[in-house]
């Protein structure tokens, strides 16, 4: 079986990668500048070449060589390039140095000459002065030999089975002469209760003050949760199966709250915002607010604001956030809360990516097939690796990502020990 192939630029931990794999593609290379993200991608995608580099410094020929695909036609290039600024009057926004990552995304697409591309970004690119920048991006693709779906859309992941309000611009294009893809039709909604209702309360396990995993007995899953736990076959998932223990609860390192915080969390009604912390309390029959990545190093490197659990007076865990983002339970994130939430908050929900990938598959006129091969996940050390060790492993500087000015969270000390309390 020969599956269509793709390359993910700005891959992060792999939300787009996973969604397109589930749509029937083989991701042959993934590029990201962050060694921690690259380590997670390497762990979760053992068949994909991980390239820890800025897209500014990579070429199409280099990616072909690393991926081992020679001159084979690439079916899809995907990616969400950050854009930091907009130009003064009289200067093209795409030429602005602050937007060089978008410029180089376009460049690498031109060098690789895939049949299709998908450019994902914030919905803000579609409003006000930002639309001029988006127009320049579209023109750059058109001048490079691509037709673009100019009636671009902002898609809400909640319309594609993700229990989260998350709106993203999806821009799609095809090499001239190939049919343009259509946008996916909504597939229905999933609730918070569907997503996390079967997960046992992390605070029932003292081990989770020291590490992020434990063997646990789960409750009765919804269909959504059964798919993510691997307890039921999802007929729309054409990705590789992974070897993992479905009784393992991962990504569940606990957060210690003051008693006052717990009282406030318990008192607030579902779907309301707790006034002191400004955290939203989730409702079992609702959807989650947008999960974010937290602040950068130059802004204090704070962990992202996390919603309050709907039935327990605490914030949600990384695993609960992953469920709300449509990641399967075999998918692992960094063991620390800061990196784990950063990886989720920076990523495209796999179910949204799968819906888009399915439309590219239709445009290719190919029928997706489920591989029979089951993949072993990577070495466990990749999940707890430090930035210094991750950088050394990939042969890059440990300062390629600005250092966190606050210590990365470590396993929480026992309650009788001195600890940093979350009072927000």
UniProtKB/Swiss-Prot annotation:
Database matches in SUPFAM superfamilies: S-adenosyl-L-methionine-dependent methyltransferases (SSF53335)
A GO molecular function term, named singly, is: DNA (cytosine-5-)-methyltransferase activity
Chain intervals for the UniProt region annotation (Disordered): 404-424
Top-level taxon:
Bacteria
Active site (UniProt): 83
List keywords of the entry alphabetically: DNA-binding, Methyltransferase, Restriction system, S-adenosyl-L-methionine, Transferase
Uppermost EC category: transferase
> Which GO biological process annotations does it have?
DNA restriction-modification system; methylation
Q: What is its EC number?
A: 2.1.1.37
Residue ranges, compositional bias (Basic and acidic residues): 406-424
Q: Which InterPro entries match?
A: C5-Methyltransferase (IPR050390), C5_DNA_meth_AS (IPR018117), C5_MeTfrase (IPR001525), C5_meth_CS (IPR031303), SAM-dependent_MTases_sf (IPR029063)
Residue ranges constituting the SAM-dependent MTase C5-type domain according to the UniProt record: 4-367
Which reaction is catalysed here? a 2'-deoxycytidine in DNA + S-adenosyl-L-methionine = a 5-methyl-2'-deoxycytidine in DNA + S-adenosyl-L-homocysteine + H(+)
What family, per the record?
Belongs to the class I-like SAM-binding methyltransferase superfamily. C5-methyltransferase family.
UniProt-listed NCBIfam families: dcm
Q: What does this protein do?
A: A methylase that recognizes the double-stranded sequence 5'-CGATCG-3', methylates C-? on both strands and protects the DNA from cleavage by the XorII endonuclease.
| Name of the featured protein | Type II methyltransferase M.XorII
Look up and give the organism this protein is from. Answer: Xanthomonas oryzae pv. oryzae (strain KACC10331 / KXO85)
Organism lineage: Bacteria, Pseudomonadati, Pseudomonadota, Gammaproteobacteria, Lysobacterales
């Amino acid at each position: 079986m020969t599956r269509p192939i793709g390359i993910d630029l700005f891959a992060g931990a792999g939300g787009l990668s996973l969604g397109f794999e589930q749509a029937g593609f083989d991701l042959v290379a993934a590029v990201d500048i962050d060694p921690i993200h690259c380590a997670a991608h390497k762990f979760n995608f053992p068949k994909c070449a991980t390239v820890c580099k800025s897209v500014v410094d990579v070429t199409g020929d280099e990616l072909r060589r690393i991926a081992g695909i020679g001159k084979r036609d690439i079916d899809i290039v995907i990616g969400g390039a950050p854009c930091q600024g907009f130009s003064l009057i009289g200067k093209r926004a795409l030429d602005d140095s602050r937007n060089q990552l978008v410029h180089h995304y376009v460049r690498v697409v031109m060098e690789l000459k895939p049949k299709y591309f998908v450019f994902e970004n914030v919905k803000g690119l579609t409003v006000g002065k930002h639309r001029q920048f988006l127009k320049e991006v579209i023109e750059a693709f058109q001048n490079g030999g691509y037709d673009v779906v100019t009636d671009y859309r902002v898609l809400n992941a909640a319309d594609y089975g993700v229990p989260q309000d998350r709106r993203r611009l999806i821009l799609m294009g095809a090499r001239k002469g190939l049919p343009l893809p259509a946008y996916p039709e909504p597939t229905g909604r999933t609730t918070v209760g569907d997503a996390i209702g079967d997960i046992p309360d992390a605070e029932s396990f003292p081990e989770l003050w020291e590490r992020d995993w434990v063997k646990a007995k789960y409750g009765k899953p919804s269909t959504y949760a059964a798919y993510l736990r691997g307890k039921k076959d999802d007929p729309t998932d054409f990705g590789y199966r992974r070897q993992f223990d479905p009784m393992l609860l991962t990504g569940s390192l606990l957060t210690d709250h003051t008693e006052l915080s717990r009282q406030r969390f318990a008192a607030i009604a579902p779907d309301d915002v707790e006034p002191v912390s400004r955290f939203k309390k989730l409702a079992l029959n609702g959807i989650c607010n947008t999960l974010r990545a937290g602040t950068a190093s130059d802004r204090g490197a704070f962990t992202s604001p996390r919603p309050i659990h709907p039935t327990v007076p605490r914030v949600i865990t990384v695993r609960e956030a992953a469920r709300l983002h449509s990641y399967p339970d075999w998918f692992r994130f960094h063991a620390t809360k800061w990196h784990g939430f950063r990886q989720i908050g920076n990523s495209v929900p796999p179910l949204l990516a799968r819906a888009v990938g399915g439309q590219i598959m239709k445009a290719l006129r190919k029928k997706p097939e489920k591989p029979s091969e089951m993949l072993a996940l990577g070495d466990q050390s990749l999940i707890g690796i430090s930035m210094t060790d991750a950088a050394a492993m990939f042969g890059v500087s440990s300062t390629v990502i600005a250092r966190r000015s606050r210590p990365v969270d470590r396993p929480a000390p026992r309650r009788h020990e001195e600890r940093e309390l979350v009072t927000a």
